[in-house]
Amino acid sequence: YVDKMLTGRKDAFLYPAEYDNVSGYSEPQESKHDFFVIGHTSTSVSLASGLAKGRDLIGGNENIIAVIGDGSLSGGEAFEGLDYMAELGTNMIIIVNDNQMSIAENHGGLYKNLKELRDSNGQCECNFFKAMGLDYIYVNDGNDVQALIEAFSKVKDIQHPIVVHINTLKGKGYAHAEQDKETYHWRTPFNPETGEAKVSYEE
């Protein structure tokens, strides 16, 4: 949604009369900045790998950046994208926002390894991303803007695929959101002091 706000569609989020003028997800008919019609999960890495291939074919030098959350990382499409990027071997920056949160809950061996990486500050011997042939760096405090700037400055214009694994706290700085990640993942209007919803579905 922030992407839509930054690409000329903010009115749909500000004015009720404009609400139906944008879709919930990426839609090329809405904006030149939307390249695909997609859903909301596990798609970014594979789509970015296609953009990277297209860039390489025309001799471009843009940074291709995919952002994916840990909850979406176990999707098959994400695995395919990571696998292909390792083979392509050219510039792509894969940002993994690891906030240990998924509405459906995270299960599987991948999440055990993500925990090992967090617990070891990214240094544990077993590293899923490196095993796939990808470069890797870890940011322990992903809510620290300066730490993010430093990490992104290091990987900008890199000539091979790299994973930037960022450990974040969902809702950082707002106690109600920190304590109730699922409710604040998608929220109706609420009182910022009490955290209580201003509307009820039972009304």
Region spans (language model):
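Residue-level preference for the first positions of well-ordered beta-strands
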Residues: 63-65, 91-93, 161-163
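Terminal amphipathic helices with adjacent charged low-complexity linkers/tails
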Residues: 96, 103, 143-198
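Mobile "lid/hinge" segments at catalytic clefts and subdomain interfaces of large enzymes
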Residues: 74, 81, 86-120, 126-128
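Cofactor-binding active-site loop characterized by glycine-rich and histidine/acidic residues
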Residues: 1-88, 203
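Structural beta-sheet core signal
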Residues: 50, 66-67, 94-96, 166
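Short, glycine-/Ser/Thr-/acidic-enriched flexible segments
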Residues: 1-2, 30-32, 71-73, 99-101, ...
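Short acidic, glycine/serine/threonine-rich loops at helix termini
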Residues: 2-8, 73-82, 104-109, 115, ...
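Conserved thiamine diphosphate
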Residues: 25-28, 53-63, 108-151, 199
